[in-house]
């Protein structure tokens, strides 16, 4: 992946102020702001980060200490492998680790327990944007103060709506 014009992108103080005026900052592996996350965390603004499937990427390791909600996509590991991975990620800083598993649903680890949720059955037209929609629904639940299971349910519902039509991205 080549960043193009984003390779030289840097947040200004005005950008940081704008981001921190919101209830939550959401970014991802391609957002190129991982070196600035500490400035957001210093202001006690929660950070959600979409690491996609980049489990061992250098950005992943740099960002984790400043992330509250760490999202990963992984549908090729056993439950035992996922649990081990999620415990390891949680130990690096995030408050909650969320893994979407495609048609196998999702799993969340909050440091105390693993919570699993399946999918919302629907007709799949185009899976593009399913993960982003899950993240949006999950985080909406967080902002509404919902328990983890309900956040997962909101994420799955949002995802099911997105994959029901072509060109969601």
Model-derived regions: residue spans:
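Ribokinase/PfkB-type carbohydrate-kinase core domain
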Residues: 1-115
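Conserved phosphate-binding/catalytic region of the ribokinase-like
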Residues: 83-169
